Amino acid sequence: MKTYGTTQGQIAFAASKNHFHGSLNEKAQYQFEVSVEDVLKDREISYPLTRAMCAPIGDGAAAALICSEKGLKHFPTEIQQRAIKIKASVLSGGKYRTPQETGLSRVAAKKAYRQADLEPKDINFVEVHDATSFCEIYQLEMLGFCEIGTGGKFVEEGHTQLGGKLPVNLSGGLVSKGHPVGATGLSMIHELAVQLRGEAGKRQSKRNKIGLAENGGGVIGFEEAACSVIILEGSH
């Protein structure tokens, strides 16, 4: 915040936006809206974070059926038509980094873009691991959607909300959808699949050909111990 000028208000905007998205998700843990003002007024956890900026731990489960293109042909036509293609799947391990170094998700994202033969501008919508709402701002920068230090402004300008140029965490993110820990990563994949199939209802992204999910866990110094970036493409 001191280096790049990211504000508490911008973090609150990200939180409020995700609470709105969560209010449209019948599977979200928190299905209510929270204004930017109320996010800022909420109980402080550790400055600049208030309670409404932090993900709640909750129960949950998620599953996915994965098969080869050849194996898909053995399924009924209606299932084949709903299949989602894995364009890239990358898992990167962390190391001790200084606060000045780019994060592990930048490493994983670059590999994923190469694997998928895509660029950040090709991604239509994103799910990121927002254990806190600051994480969303940070990951937008690491994933290459905006320049380092400009994530807060990018969010505040409304680009990441439903109907924006890059909708982020249409599920509500961890902050609103909830953080079922072991099921969190796969729940992001579920949201991508729902969006790619055009089945997200009121929170449906208009542009829904290609989606990206970033998930991280563990800690090494200032960094995640592991990070995955997955890019999926719809069949339409």
Regions found by a protein language model. Give the residues of each.
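Phosphate/pyrophosphate-binding loops at sites that engage ATP/ADP/AMP, CoA/4′-phosphopantetheine
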Residues: 1-7, 109-122, 200
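Acyl-CoA/ACP chain-elongation machinery
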Residues: 15-29, 93-98, 132-138, 182-193, ...
